[in-house]
Amino acid sequence: MNVSSACGECETVLQSVSAAVVADESFLETVLTAVLAEGHVLIEDVPGTGKTLTARSFASALGLSFSRIQFTPDLLPGDITGTYVYREDEGTFTFTEGPIFANFVLADEINRAPPKTQAALLEAMAERQVTVDGETRPLPEPFVVIATQNPVESEGVFPLPAAQKDRFLVKTEIGYPEPAAERALLRARTRREARTPAAETVLDADGVRRLQAVPESVTVDDDILDYIVDVVEQTRTDARVEVGASPRGTQRLLEAARARAVIEGRSFVRPVDVTTVARPVLGHRLIRTTDATVDGTGTAEVLDDVLDAVSVPTVRAEDGEAPPTEG
């Protein structure tokens, strides 16, 4: 599959999902960027904004198997990974797969489960395999996790440590729809019998795997690589940041920028691809200083200043395009 074909597939997927989910286009593109880059998504938003529907709709549009794990304080690692069950008639133990064995996994309210259970999910995300009783089992491919958490409630939750947040390619939010979009949501509800809309299936697992291979063919100039390094370095030297983005964050920024270029139908990365994905890719990887937190300085504000402080390179024209003029 070439970039042009991949771009067309991406447009088809977004159209299918947007028919079911009332959300800003940039949010849906951020989730698709993570899927293309073989990453995972953390959605932090209040209840009722469509987090679960988003996960189901993407799984349906992509033709992938889907499972939902409701995280609770009493959830055990085995409830996620699966366990061995003794078969009395056979006199043997048989492994029963847990809900993690799906292409698209929704980890709902991930911060409600204790750290040990969270760690079981994070291991699966990082290694794409699970280990039960010393036996390692690979997870199906493609494998994407969308985890959600509610930013409002603080009682009975176990906040994700920075090291675990770092495993997510992007962190994003849906937000409330515009009044016009919300009216359209109500009109659509009156025209269907089902309580929940469904996205049309437009791909399958093999198609998704071919789609995920395309970003690796996207060209990245040395100037763009330098730009990515400079942006990440700026997060580490900003006085309001105690801990900046890690080298893993640098690599994820590159991967997301390449995926973004594919969505835009380009075979090369432009600076605007980097700036577009920088906030969802880097925001959750920064730890602000105590003073910045007390002052109410958010990571979005820090990243805006970081991007303003770094010189934007001029990339050579390709594919008949005029040279970009960002910055």
Regions found by a protein language model. Give the residues of each.
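Pre-Walker A (pre-P-loop) alpha-helix and adjacent loop at the N terminus of AAA/AAA+ ATPase modules
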Residues: 4-41, 46, 236
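Walker A/P-loop
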Residues: 35-73, 77, 86
